[in-house]
Curated annotation (Swiss-Prot):
Principal location: secreted
Protein name: Neurotoxin LmNaTx45.2
Keyword Nucleus: no
Entry-linked Gene3D superfamilies: Knottin, scorpion toxin-like
One GO molecular-function entry: sodium channel inhibitor activity
Subcellular location: Secreted
CDD domains found in the cross-reference section: neurotoxins_LC_scorpion
Gene Ontology cellular component terms for the protein in this record: extracellular region
Listed PROSITE patterns: LCN_CSAB
Amino acid sequence: MKLAILSLFLVFQIGVESKKNGFALDHYGKPWECNLFNVFGPYCNNQCTENKARKGYCCTFTCYCFDLPDDAKILEIGDSRKNYCDVSLTDVLG
């Protein structure tokens, strides 16, 4: 019985870490912008992975990051833009 109570206690003490997608913000509270010169390069992926995301790419001229930690600050945007950017080009192309 003590083991069952201890197990339940431990289950509730262990936090669940989830990931989120979005436009990560820099230390000024602004998202990283991408342009015609770096839209296809590694710029956004580098910015996102430095921010502890799994990967990132340029979407609507702003760097969009996948699997950011819960504590990462992201730009609050409308659902339609987020849904559009949630489909990674690398996921679509393979």
